[in-house]
């Protein structure tokens, strides 16, 4: 046999290595997570490069709706992203350089949502759908005491 079967779906991922190894048609990296990472990194470093990156990520999210992107505009966004990622960062903070290296490895997965109209730019909808279950799992052992129950009530409100 030898050949792997590609499944006909696009996985929206948080960049975990196991997720990126999933056998699927392609991946879309969650841009909400990348934007959040850019915000945090900019607060720590004040990097202008990170601000450019955040701006283009936001544009990709905005343009990821099927009716709002034309081929020429999409190609322009992809070209600008490549230019940003390929900039030399000789005087940048080490964490900024690390982010750049990580993004270069997955750059094809950043703009998938511009090519496939049904693919969302972020996976927050999945995370929201499991939030209540996960929250209950985290605090369920505390419900045996009055203090635990009160803490749970505060968290849920």
Residue locations for each model-derived region?
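Catalytic center-proximal scaffold of phosphoryl-transfer enzymes
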Residues: 1-157
């Amino acid at each position: 046999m030898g050949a792997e079967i590609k499944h006909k779906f696009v996985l929206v991922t948080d960049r975990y290595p196991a997720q990126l190894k999933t056998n699927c048609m392609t991946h879309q990296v969650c841009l909400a997570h990348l934007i959040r990472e850019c915000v945090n990194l900019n607060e720590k470093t004040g990097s202008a490069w990170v601000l450019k990156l955040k701006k283009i990520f936001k544009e990709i999210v905005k343009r990821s709706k099927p009716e709002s992107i034309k081929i020429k505009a999409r190609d322009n966004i992809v070209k600008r992203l490549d230019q940003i990622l390929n900039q030399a960062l000789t005087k940048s903070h080490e964490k900024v350089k690390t982010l750049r290296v990580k993004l270069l490895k997955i750059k094809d997965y950043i703009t998938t949502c511009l090519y496939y109209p049904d693919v969302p730019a972020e996976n927050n909808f999945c995370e929201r759908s499991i939030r209540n279950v996960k929250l209950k799992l985290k605090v369920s052992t505390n419900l045996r005491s009055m203090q635990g129950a009160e803490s749970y009530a505060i968290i849920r409100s």
